[in-house]
């Protein structure tokens, strides 16, 4: 499936984001884009926020639109439901657990098949994790330097629980 391969700092500069949100510890030397201080219309503000959400979560337009359509069909506040759907993506959960430094790295760890959900290997980054699912690192992948390095640097959010010894999460 397609994904955005545009340079991270360039895109952050365009959207006015801090690269540290994405786990990138670099800064752009060029500052903001020209005309960054101009007043945006309401539509421009909405579009910019949508583009930020798409970029941060690494989702393409068509997939984002499908999630939006599903959120509008469900009962509740559409924006909150959309963010819940984005947060429950497998690659995002791996990032939140601290098994990777960035969402892009989490996507790669998932696509290379280093993880299991409920004992079954899942290599689809957009898989929506359900409440009660058990995520584990495969036996062959427990010695990966990337995973060991990332575990020591992150704190896990309250809606997830992580066992560092067994390398499993709920």
PLM segments and residue spans:
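Short glycine/serine/threonine-biased micro-segments
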Residues: 96, 111, 117
């Amino acid at each position: 499936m397609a994904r955005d391969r545009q340079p991270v700092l360039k895109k952050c500069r365009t959207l006015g984001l801090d690269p540290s949100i994405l786990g990138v510890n670099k800064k752009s030397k060029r500052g903001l884009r020209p005309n960054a201080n101009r007043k945006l219309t309401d539509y421009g503000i909405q579009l910019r926020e949508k583009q930020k959400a798409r970029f941060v979560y690494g989702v393409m337009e068509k997939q984002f639109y499908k999630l939006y359509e599903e959120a509008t069909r469900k009962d509740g506040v559409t924006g909150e439901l959309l963010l819940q759907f984005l947060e429950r993506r497998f690659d995002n959960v791996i990032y939140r657990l601290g098994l990777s430094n960035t969402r892009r790295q989490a996507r790669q760890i998932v696509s290379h098949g280093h993880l299991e959900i409920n004992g079954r290997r899942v290599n689809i980054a957009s898989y929506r994790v359900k409440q009660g699912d058990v995520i584990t690192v495969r036996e062959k992948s427990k010695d990966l330097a990337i995973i060991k390095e990332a575990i020591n640097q992150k704190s896990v959010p309250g809606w997830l629980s992580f066992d560092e010894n067994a390398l499993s999460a709920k």
